[in-house]
Amino acid sequence: MKKITLLTIVALLSFGANAQSLLPTKYGIKVGLNIANVTSTPNEGVDNIETTPLLGVAGGFYMEIALNDKWYINPELLYVQKGASFNYDYTHKWDSIGTNQTNNEDKYGTTNSLKLAYVELNPTISYKASDKLALNFGPSVSFLISEDFVPIENIIGDNPPQNAVENKLATYASEDLDVGLNLGISYYLTENFLVDAKVNTGFMKIGAVNKTTSTAKNGNERIEKVFELNNRAIVLSFAYLF
């Protein structure tokens, strides 16, 4: 019994020492600019996809946990704006019921705006190469809290669309979770003030632009999904530590 009690005390003391070593050595706030974009995988009938980065804000809480004099864990909890503006052309294929009109086509060009807001958790691992410079890497877990998708379509060519009634505007089907990877560097201007730059690459599909590009009448295959999207971003930020 005495041995068990002694071992328990030693284990508790050891756990307490390890837990104390994982307490944050510094807390801080981080504010910056997020240069966001998306990558896409188009389906049949979709052409000329062009994306334009969206500028957003990124900010939240930041801390440093020293493992030793070189290695740190730097968790972040941030509000981040992502998304992009993107254009694409597509062909709307349709057949007429009860007539001999088959394989008809209308060509459209589109302009789209997608704005997303996330709460992002970044358990970053940091290696201090010097007193001023640190190399950072780690996973990123993002939870979607809001979205805004605005599609605009225009017919390509001089002729009006023959089947505009059935050609509905595109919709966006979002995913609530995104998991990715952060790679970056930090430069300490002072002991408590640093500049941070990182690249974020999302691994999961964040959503899909849905659009009926073939009505599937008279035996044709119905095509509804235009393309799926993934997040990409460059983040430039400042952090102040207390």
State each model region's role.
Residues K30-G32, E76-L78, G138-S140, K198-N200, ...:
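Transmembrane beta-strands of outer-membrane beta-barrel proteins
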Residues L33, M63-I65, I125-Y127, F143, ...:
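Residue-level signature of outer-membrane beta-barrel architecture
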Residues G59-F61, L121-P123, L183, L236-F238:
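Membrane-embedded beta-strands of outer-membrane beta-barrel proteins
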Residues W71-I73, K132-L135, N192-A197:
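Repeated loop/turn-to-beta-strand initiation elements of outer-membrane beta-barrel proteins
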Residues N34, Y187-F193, E228-F242:
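Outer-membrane beta-barrel "beta-signal"
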Residues N37-L54, K82-L116, L144-D178, N182, ...:
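Extracellular/periplasm-exposed beta-strand and loop segments of Gram-negative cell-envelope proteins
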Residues M1-K30, F238-F242:
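Bacterial Sec-dependent N-terminal signal peptides
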